[in-house]
Amino acid sequence: MDLQKQLEELKISTQEKLKEMTGNHTKELQDLRVQVLGKKGSLTELLKGLKDLSNDLRPVVGKQVNEVRDILTKAFEEQAKVVEAAKIQAQLESESVDVTLPGRQMTLGHRHVLTQTSEEIEDIFLGMGFQVVDGFEVEKDYYNFERMNLPKDHPARDMQDTFYITEEILLRTHTSPVQARTMDQHDFSKGPLKMISPGRVFRRDTDDATHSHQFHQIEGLVVGENISMGDLKGTLQLISQKMFGAERKIRLRPSYFPFTEPSVEVDVSCFKCGGKGCNVCKQTGWIEILGAGMVHPSVLEMSGIDSEKYSGFAFGLGQERIAMLRYGINDIRGFYQGDVRFTDQF
């Protein structure tokens, strides 16, 4: 067969095969390219026939070979684009989303049980006319201890192991410094001070089922004229009933805190057994929930408040303890370990 005719037939047959290829023929396209244009391909075999042509015909056929090679090379490149586009389109169609289908319900998170407890307690106090005041977690020794009637040589400082950053800077061991700063700024000509200060506090405790090196407190303070122990008891009675039920009673036991005088521990009648005695109240009928007392005159005087004219009461409770009592939780570490099997229960 004439070499020129073979070249034309190779061009035509290859072009026809290329037109039949779609997105599913990526491998076939590559195989055909090797078969036609490869080192051992059809076009290379035809080139070998040039040596048998006459000197006059050889340049003419050689030019035709180059033209066919260029045409087929371009054809392969264009068809490769067509095949790739078809492949992408097929993939898009197979992965398309039916927008008429109902959406998938996502798993939603919720507030942590300690956050829920804190917000509930804050709402109770807001309803009683208290203001919520935030403060610094990194605090000065002066506000954390000295302003709470705990000078540097006071033995009661041993009651709280402290994380010191420097000799004068520490992680607060209670939220009482917020109260000291607020008393400094309050204008008593506009009425009494009624505040709570919630937040994290830090003490050098060994973590176990009932202790943690960090936990949460809400401390409350009321300062004004003629504030009495009766006001404190009435406030605590209302708080206990709001948190644990309207039938709850409280009792006050003498205690000691450097910043209050007199000081008391506050117990609430057991909400599980109604005061009859059970494992929750350790057969006593009462559960300790917080500490409180009348603000020490020295604490008032350090804020420039006339202790002869003004008096006040203070109290402090822990959100973890309240939550543990309400929900029957026996290990405080569960609040901080991030185990959703625990947190999802609340």
Curated annotation (Swiss-Prot):
It comes from the Bacteria. Its main location: cytoplasm. Mg(2+) binds at residue 261. One of its GO terms (biological process) is phenylalanyl-tRNA aminoacylation. Its cofactor is Mg(2+). Its EC number is 6.1.1.20. The keyword Protein biosynthesis applies. It catalyses: tRNA(Phe) + L-phenylalanine + ATP = L-phenylalanyl-tRNA(Phe) + AMP + diphosphate + H(+). It is an enzyme of class 6 (ligase). Binds 2 magnesium ions per tetramer. Keywords: Aminoacyl-tRNA synthetase, ATP-binding, Cytoplasm, Ligase, Magnesium, Metal-binding, Nucleotide-binding, Protein biosynthesis. The keyword Ligase applies. GO terms for cellular component: cytoplasm. GO terms for molecular function: ATP binding; catalytic activity, acting on a protein; magnesium ion binding; phenylalanine-tRNA ligase activity; transferase activity; tRNA binding. It is found in: Cytoplasm. Tetramer of two alpha and two beta subunits. NCBIfam families: pheS (TIGR00468). Belongs to the class-II aminoacyl-tRNA synthetase family. Phe-tRNA synthetase alpha subunit type 1 subfamily. This is Phenylalanine--tRNA ligase alpha subunit. It comes from Streptococcus agalactiae serotype V (strain ATCC BAA-611 / 2603 V/R).
